[in-house]
Design a protein with these regions (language model features):
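Small-polar-interrupted transmembrane alpha-helices in polytopic inner-membrane proteins
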Residues: 26-41, 83-137, 152-164
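Alpha-helical transmembrane segments that form the membrane-embedded catalytic/substrate-binding core
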Residues: 76-83, 125-136, 178-199
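Membrane-interface transmembrane helices that cradle and orient dolichyl/undecaprenyl
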Residues: 139-146
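Alpha-helical transmembrane segments and their cytosolic membrane-interface
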Residues: 46-50, 65-83, 91-102
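Extracytosolic (periplasmic/ER-lumenal) interhelical loops and adjacent juxtamembrane/interface segments
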Residues: 45-72, 164-171
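Terminal transmembrane helical module of multi-pass membrane proteins
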Residues: 153-203
Length: 205
């Protein structure tokens, strides 16, 4: 005889936030990737950041590592919270390999955009651009399912990017001076561009 164990309230909550089982473990690991580099201090950040001069000298690893280091703990924590929000909204919309492609596509678009279009930017750190790519890809999945929140998210993204391109960083993000708003635009384009060629899950949760 098969007996199913009743699902309690906490388990239902974790599942609704895409934090149950292996997804929850993966989220903790992803947050650790963003938070732990802070322990390396200024030296670690300077060794891993996007640095135009260092890249020209052949230090290509910075094209990847720059997106996982931050100015300080507050900056890393803010981006970790953004990751948790993106995870809760979108984690089940694509398979893990698809999410990896979206992440790498977003990072590549940011790197290319900064190198080719923003030559005045000497250095860059942070995950916010990549998170914008993740948000764009998840929003596209919801639009394909004709979910109402997909349209709401799409309007939010367009309005946010338009504001940033015309007026600069949002007021509540100015605590970290020098926010590179173009990274948000490039990340969005990269994430949406990759997601356009992927098949998301089509059933709503």
């Amino acid at each position: 005889m098969n007996v199913s164990r009743p699902v309690n309230g906490i388990e239902r909550l974790l599942k609704s936030l895409n934090c149950d089982g292996k997804l929850g473990i993966a989220l903790l690991a992803a947050c650790a990737v963003l938070l732990l580099p802070v322990l390396a201090g200024d030296a670690g950040r300077e060794a891993l950041r996007y640095d135009r001069t260092a890249l020209a000298a052949g230090q290509e690893w910075r094209l990847l590592t720059a997106h996982f280091v931050h100015l300080d703990f507050d900056h890393a924590a803010l981006n970790s919270l953004g990751l948790v929000l993106m995870w809760a909204l979108f984690a089940r919309d694509y398979r893990p390999r698809q999410w990896l492609a979206i992440l790498l596509g977003s990072i590549a678009a940011i790197d290319a955009g900064l190198w080719l279009r923003d030559s005045t930017i000497a250095w860059y750190v942070g995950s916010s651009g990549a998170l914008h790519g993740i948000m764009a890809a998840g929003t596209l999945a919801h639009l394909r399912r004709r979910d109402l929140d997909g349209w709401i998210l799409a309007v939010f993204i367009v309005v946010k990017l338009a504001y940033e391109q015309s007026a600069g960083a949002l007021p509540f993000t100015d605590n970290h001076s020098g926010v590179v708003v173009d990274a948000h635009l490039f990340g969005t384009l990269g994430g949406a561009g990759i997601a356009a060629f992927l098949a998301p899950r089509m059933e709503s949760l």
